A protein has these predicted regions:
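Nucleotide-sugar donor-binding catalytic core of glycosyltransferases
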Residues: 5, 10-276, 291-301, 344, ...
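Flexible glycine/serine/alanine-rich "lid" or loop that lines and gates the nucleotide-sugar donor pocket
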Residues: 260-261, 281-283
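Pol beta-like nucleotidyltransferase catalytic core
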Residues: 200-202, 282-363
Length: 363
């Protein structure tokens, strides 16, 4: 008997992503789904909030293949949604107010909860309760629970669902712009090569919690400071600080060059616990320096002294001073560990796939 092969065409899944307004996480998720071949409809609850606040993200989403933005309109919703991603923040009350309309059409729901470690534990649990109450009977369709800023060991959602962090990627400009993407992801650095910059900070001083960390270390980067860690290593220190009100960052190509020339990159938290900087540093072989309680947020298996330096109990000054005492063989060892992470963790296709798996789209 002749055995004929049968070609089964996979049905395109119907994915909708609810947000109050688009932000960097919206792009991270939509782009990861797009490169995985999925069509994504981003249902924006309050489109007027996007004017000026996330214009760049909004534009990048519109230019991303297989992604479309839909202003809140129940008439635009399909009769059935295969996968609904509910991104509760950055404005939880507004997002939840309009979540029932798509939720009652959804076969499966991925909830990205705002009840994470950015809030005190009691407030996080209260927020999770509000989310479940807002979804009502449709909450039983939640099969994936994610957090941007990590989760507590015990919380309400963890009582009945497995929990994961979403993970993060480089800033959208390094994903969306083809030239910058290739520059950021190029494996053109040698783990064994001595670098000319010991440490850098590149970014905004805002918000206040980041400014407090920077106030503790700023003088260590000053070229006339006798306490500068660079004196012990004969390497320079690079500092480029600005405010949100006057956001004058480095040219993206210069930014990549500084990371590529730096042994260490300071990654203090900003408005969220997660920032793009640790991933950007890893991609250029620069060892991230970040808070000890943020190592589990990125989905890249950070380990202190192996592929990063952790800051304990907000002791940023002591940590930066200690960088000058890290010997060159130790720096090369950590950089070699980072290089070994590339294929399965850091390369964009691998990172995007892991995000899709956590969302529930790929196995």
């Amino acid at each position: 008997m002749e055995n004929r092969g049968v070609v089964v065409r996979r049905r395109t899944m119907n994915v909708w992503h609810l947000v109050c307004r688009t932000d960097s996480l919206t792009y991270t998720i939509a782009k990861a789904l797009s490169v995985g071949g999925h069509d994504v409809s981003v249902w924006v609850v309050n489109p007027s909030l996007d004017h000026g606040l996330s214009e760049g993200i909004h534009t990048s989403l519109r230019e991303t293949p297989r992604v479309r933005i839909v202003a809140r309109d129940e008439m635009a919703l399909p009769p059935a949604i295969d996968r609904l991603v509910i991104q509760v923040f950055p404005r939880p009350q507004e997002a939840l107010l309009h979540a029932k309309a798509p939720a009652r059409r959804a076969q499966r729901i991925t909830l990205i909860s705002a009840g994470d470690r950015s809030r005190p534990w009691r407030d996080a649990v209260k927020q999770q309760l509000r989310e479940l109450r807002s979804l009502g009977i449709h909450a039983n369709r939640i099969d994936h629970v994610l957090y941007k800023d990590g989760f507590y060991r015990r919380d309400l959602l963890g009582m009945f669902k497995a929990r994961h962090c979403v993970g993060f990627d480089p800033h959208s400009q390094f994903i969306h712009n083809a030239e910058l993407f290739h520059a950021m992801y190029a494996r053109d650095w040698d783990p064994d090569a001595r670098r000319t910059i010991l440490a850098n900070f590149l970014g905004s001083r805002d918000p206040e919690i980041r400014k407090r960390a920077l106030d503790n270390v700023r003088l260590l980067f000053h070229p006339t400071s006798g306490s500068s860690a660079s004196l012990a290593t004969h390497k320079s220190m690079r500092w480029h600080e600005y405010s949100d009100a006057a956001a004058i960052g480095l040219d993206p190509r210069e930014f990549i060059r500084v990371l590529s020339d730096s042994d260490f990159t300071l990654c203090p938290r900003g408005y969220s616990l997660v920032t793009h900087r640790p991933i950007e540093a890893l991609l250029r072989g620069s060892i991230p320096v970040l808070s000890e309680d943020e190592l589990d947020l990125y989905g890249v298996d950070f380990k202190d002294g192996q592929n990063c330096i952790s800051v304990r109990e907000a002791r940023w000054r002591e940590t930066v001073e200690s960088l000058a005492r890290v010997e060159e063989p130790e720096i090369r060892r950590m950089r070699t560990n980072i290089d070994a992470m590339f294929d399965e963790i850091l390369d964009y296709p691998a990172m995007a796939k892991q995000i899709r798996v956590r969302i529930g789209m790929d196995s």
